[in-house]
Amino acid sequence: MNSSPDPLAALTATDPTIADLIRAEERRQSEKIRLIPSENYVSKAVLEATGTVLTNKYSEGYPNRRYYEGQQFIDQIETIAIERAKQLFGVDHANVQPYSGSPANLAIYLALLSPGDTVMGMALPMGGHLTHGWPVSATGIWFRSVQYGVRRDTGRIDFDEVREVARRERPKVIFAGGTAIPRIIDFAAFAEIAREVNAVLVADIAHISGLVAGGVHPSPVGHADIISTTTHKTLRGPRGAMLMSTEQYAKALDKAVFPGLQGGPHNHTTAAIAVALLEAMQPEFRDYARNIVANAAVLAEELLARGFDLVSGGTDNHLILVDLTSKGVAGKPVARALDRAGIELNYNTVPFDPRKPFDPSGIRLGTPAVTSRGMGPAEMRQIAAWIDEVTTAVAKGDEEALAAVEQRVAGEVRELTKNFPTPGLDR
């Protein structure tokens, strides 16, 4: 019998409604197969660091340059996080204060640009990110944005277009990276183009930072002037972000983060980032990164064998983008049916998608979270089979038959997940 104290005992006594909802979310994360590629599980150590008294302390400024007293221990924690980031990624400078990925990217704009300046990024429907200048984002409203995409024949970044647009539009900043890129990003090719047009190259590695740290994706260091990343995806840290750069941009970035955009940093998050970075420096993390990529390759291979159309024909990293057009269904109904069946992924636009963003042609899935639970090739093949079953049932349009498939698969998923510990949650 587990005699460990209930970690939510105080919360249950104060606010049982919230405590019950947290427990329900814990069960959901344990019982489902989580394939959203931007999600993961943090370790118990990271969870513990996040929920500490560090949240009580205001710390405007930077280590040894604060506006409030009582920073003796906060300064040490933030300095440790900075030094670990510099060591892990091999960079000159790191800022660990950005609240999340979008504020981190906005700090880059504030540091380098004036309103109306031209920026260039991957078009959102092609796999880019809102903050790379997409029109509905502040970055596309306050700045002049131009986009590049992928080749229609290969689904890979069209470097001829990147070069052509860069030469024609002369952007001051070029973003390399995105949210739905299943292939290796050629940072050297981006750097060559950026140098030609005298642009600052920003590598947004939010999705792949853990793969870079684990040595299974080429690093942008030495190619990019600035590197932006979240800490909560493949890096397995808390919800936060980091900006890394050469010394040339260090002061401008620090000033843009504080006082430009933010006040006091979230010290509890900074501590958890430090813990996650230490975990990422261990040999086991390199094994984890390799297993993410290996699992994605098996999952992609099995989906291809079952007749699914994968954007770019496969994957080199953690992410798979599936165009369901050939299956006769759209992404949203398949994603929702799979969720009811215990498999969580997201509907997503695919390159050159004729459908609307809220009802797109594709689904996006990845392997970071299932790999964190210790799943391997056999489980990837089973997951592909379940995805195929549910997709086929959706395509047939028989709601009663679909409900039966969903119910059966959900039960099978629950049985499978019992065999794999849930990081941070199993007590």
UniProtKB/Swiss-Prot annotation:
Q: What enzyme class is recorded for this protein?
A: transferase
Q: Where does (6S)-5,6,7,8-tetrahydrofolate bind?
A: L124, G128, H129, L130
What are the record's GO terms for cellular component? cytosol
Where located?
A: Cytoplasm
Which cofactors does it use? pyridoxal 5'-phosphate
Known pathway: One-carbon metabolism; tetrahydrofolate interconversion; Amino-acid biosynthesis; glycine biosynthesis; glycine from L-serine: step 1/1
Pfam families cross-referenced by the UniProt entry: SHMT (PF00464)
**Matches recorded under PROSITE patterns:** SHMT
Check the record and name the InterPro entries matching this protein: PyrdxlP-dep_Trfase, PyrdxlP-dep_Trfase_major, PyrdxlP-dep_Trfase_small, Ser_HO-MeTrfase, Ser_HO-MeTrfase-like, Ser_HO-MeTrfase_PLP_BS, SHMT-like_dom
MF (Gene Ontology): glycine hydroxymethyltransferase activity; pyridoxal phosphate binding
What is the first-listed, main subcellular location in coarse terms? cytoplasm
Q: Does the keyword Glycoprotein apply?
A: no
The EC number(s) attached to this protein equal: 2.1.2.1
Q: Which reaction does it catalyse?
A: (6R)-5,10-methylene-5,6,7,8-tetrahydrofolate + glycine + H2O = (6S)-5,6,7,8-tetrahydrofolate + L-serine
Entry-annotated residues carrying N6-(pyridoxal phosphate)lysine: K233
Q: Which Gene3D superfamilies match?
A: Aspartate Aminotransferase, domain 1 (3.90.1150.10), Type I PLP-dependent aspartate aminotransferase-like (Major domain) (3.40.640.10)
Q: CDD domains, alphabetically?
A: SHMT
Q: Where is this site: Plays an important role in substrate specificity?
A: H232
The entry's function note states:
Catalyzes the reversible interconversion of serine and glycine with tetrahydrofolate (THF) serving as the one-carbon carrier. This reaction serves as the major source of one-carbon groups required for the biosynthesis of purines, thymidylate, methionine, and other important biomolecules. Also exhibits THF-independent aldolase activity toward beta-hydroxyamino acids, producing glycine and aldehydes, via a retro-aldol mechanism.
The UniProt entry's sequence similarity note says: Belongs to the SHMT family.
Q: What is the name of the protein in this document? A: Serine hydroxymethyltransferase
Identify the species of origin.
Answer: Acidothermus cellulolyticus (strain ATCC 43068 / DSM 8971 / 11B)
